Amino acid sequence: MFAIAPADPDSPDARVLLAELGAALAHITGSDGSASFDAADVRGPRACFLVARAADGSLAGCGALRSLTDDVAELKRMYARPGSGAGAGAALLAALERQALAFGYRDVWLETRRVNARAVAFYEKHGYRVIHNFGKYAGRPEAVCLGKRPDTRAPVFL
């Protein structure tokens, strides 16, 4: 069981998780991904940054949503800390999808690198499908974009 709550992306806990995510991404892809994340994007209306904690209170992961279009939220900085317990990533993803629906988005899109096979498999397992590369990812063969229309019958989390 995980407690998931909004947090400031510049909070000490968020900075720890984002630094770990950056190091993991740099190891897998050669880039920490920080150039594609602006904390201001997840502070505005119809945006959020969430932190997950395990039952013992330890940090388990983070994730964010930002507005891409009126109908589409972009998932950013999704990270489940290794050793945080089974289900941290799934719990965070479900919370972010519920929040996207609460904000009025129809779809959730994201980008990751093709070489990050574990992430691609995780999202596909949770119903995401490969879509056209959008925005700055268009024409970039190393990028893979995925999207999903979340279940509108799920209860709102936040």
Regions found by a protein language model. Name each.
Residues F49-V51, S58-R66, E74:
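Conserved beta-strand in the GNAT
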Residues A80, G85-R98, K125:
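Conserved acetyl-CoA-binding loop-helix of GNAT-fold acetyltransferases
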Residues A40-V51:
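A short helix-loop-beta-strand connector motif used in the catalytic cores of GNAT acetyltransferases and
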Residues F2-A3, P9-D10, R106-W109, R113-A121, ...:
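C-terminal "cap" of GNAT-fold acetyltransferases
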Residues M1-G33, P155:
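Short amphipathic alpha-helix that is part of the acyltransferase structural core
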Residues R66, D71-P82, E111:
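Conserved acetyl-CoA binding element of GNAT-fold acetyltransferases
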Residues S36-A40, H132-F134:
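Short, P/G- and charge-enriched loop/turn segments at secondary-structure junctions
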